[in-house]
Amino acid sequence: MPMAVKGEVIAGKPPLFGPASARAALGMEAETYVARAGEMMNRARAIVRDNRVQAIGLFEVKRFRLCNHFSRYRIFKHIQIFNLVIQHAPASSKVVAKAMKIYCIELGDTFSRYTNRWIGLKSNDWTDYRQDMLLTTEMMQASINAEIRAIRQLLMISSLYAD
């Protein structure tokens, strides 16, 4: 028999992420991380697409900044979202959160390998770098876009979770 829903509380227990305002704040923080990563990648892709080889010296610093940004985002979503869902949500949501967490780790490893692959980038590597950079950042953008949609869904249905 389904539990009766009374506003934000099911069976006398608060929702997983707290009140709607807390879920909204988590969602906004995740959206901010994704938007910032997108901005960083878009600026770098514009430089690479314009074949501005003379800007090659900037890319190492920018790659490490983006890598650090992705690391902060990973810590945020794992601790603030995925771990809570895995610990307290129904089985179907746990499966989703576990899969998202594993995929996130794999994606982070992929980006770290990309970052490390181009340490000490030289102008004679430009053609290979350009292709790798465009493919990697496009894949990362598509992945974080899909992930933020899934995070929105986890947060939206979290009002139904009870400990």
Feature map (PLM): residue ranges:
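Small-residue-biased structural context
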Residues: 1-163
